[in-house]
A protein has these predicted regions:
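Phosphate/NTP-binding elements of NTP-utilizing enzymes
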Residues: 2-167
Length: 167
């Protein structure tokens, strides 16, 4: 098919057909952009290097650090439970410079948890601010701005996953 043939076929579409084509193309482009994402070789720890369960994502603005952490946390929640004694099998933490940064960036931001799993519910109680999944898994949000905030981190309890978010 030549470019001219394609132009003629597109010009012959009804408005409804053109809208359907646009919708399908948008979906394919979105899937190609996000679902086919693969890390660069330098973003994956080599097999022979022991990570001790820690990994650092270092990059500039817009390089996908928050997106990567949110995807990982959602995959972690949907994976096997870390502790069968805990509702939902997972107790996690999100730590940011302030609690507001954790909410705005890690939860509600364009690359945050809600963008990857709309089932996530943000709850604030006397015990703090939590992100909860329907399964019962939860992530507690912490700020690290003041000495009192840091003291709260010490009383946070054991967690199977900790996400340190920059602001």
């Amino acid at each position: 098919m030549t470019v001219t043939d394609l132009r003629e076929r597109l010009a012959g579409l009804t408005e409804a057909e053109a809208d359907l084509l646009e919708t399908k193309l948008r979906a394919k482009l979105w899937a190609k952009r996000w679902n086919a994402w693969t890390p660069y070789p330098w973003q994956v720890p080599p097999d022979e290097v022991e990570t001790h369960g820690m990994w650092l994502q270092l990059g500039g603005r817009g390089t996908g650090k928050t997106d990567g952490c949110a995807r990982y946390m959602v995959a972690h929640v949907n994976g096997p439970p870390c502790d069968d004694r805990v509702p939902g099998g997972h107790r996690m933490s999100i730590i940011a410079p302030t609690q507001g940064d954790a909410v705005e960036s890690a939860v509600n931001g364009p690359s945050g948890l809600k963008a990857h799993d709309p089932r996530v519910a943000l709850r604030t109680t006397a015990g703090g601010t939590h992100v909860r999944w329907p399964s019962g898994a939860e992530a507690k949000l912490f700020g690290a701005h003041t000495p009192d905030d840091v003291e709260r981190l010490r009383s946070g309890g054991n967690r199977c996953l900790v996400w340190l978010e920059e602001a």
